[in-house]
């Protein structure tokens, strides 16, 4: 959110806020900072309609607010994921100077493996709001909750 007002001021087009949007309050905050809309990803990993394995979904649901890490620093293709022994080892090697080509070889197909349920050698991509995901739900229920939280937040500021 720190860069959102800067982007809004710097460009002459609608701005969509993304990253860290996990509640109706965050949607209201993005709007206050000048965004005309938001993109939400991680929350919908818990949706029944999301085509991921139950193992992937459960890892996101079980994640706490400090349970994500960023890998891909050496390649310029940074990815935030739920921490795992596989990714912790990869990140440690990366910080020691792992060759980017070796990194790419070790991670080739890891996202697909996670989606298929092979989470031990998979990359369970999820944002920092993973800790706010508490249970499996429907996409409609997630949207309904976000709308209610947003409306409640806006009403507080209008009174």
List the predicted regions and their residue ranges.
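Conserved active-site-proximal phosphate/metal-binding subdomains
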Residues: 1-12, 16, 22-159
């Amino acid at each position: 959110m720190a860069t959102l007002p800067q982007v809004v001021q710097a460009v002459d087009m609608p701005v969509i806020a993304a990253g860290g949007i996990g509640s109706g309050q965050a949607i209201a905050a993005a709007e206050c900072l000048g965004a005309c809309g938001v993109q939400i990803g991680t929350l919908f990993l818990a949706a029944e309609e999301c085509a991921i394995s139950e193992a992937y979904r459960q890892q996101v649901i079980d994640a706490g607010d400090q349970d994500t890490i960023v890998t891909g620093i050496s390649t310029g293709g940074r990815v935030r994921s739920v921490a795992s022994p596989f990714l912790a080892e990869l990140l440690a090697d990366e910080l020691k100077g792992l060759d980017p080509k070796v990194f790419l070889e070790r991670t080739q197909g890891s996202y697909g493996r996670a989606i298929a349920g092979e989470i031990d050698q998979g990359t369970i991509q999820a944002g920092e709001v993973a800790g706010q995901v508490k249970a499996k739900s429907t996409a409609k229920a997630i949207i309904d909750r976000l709308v209610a939280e947003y409306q409640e937040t806006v009403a507080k500021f209008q009174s």
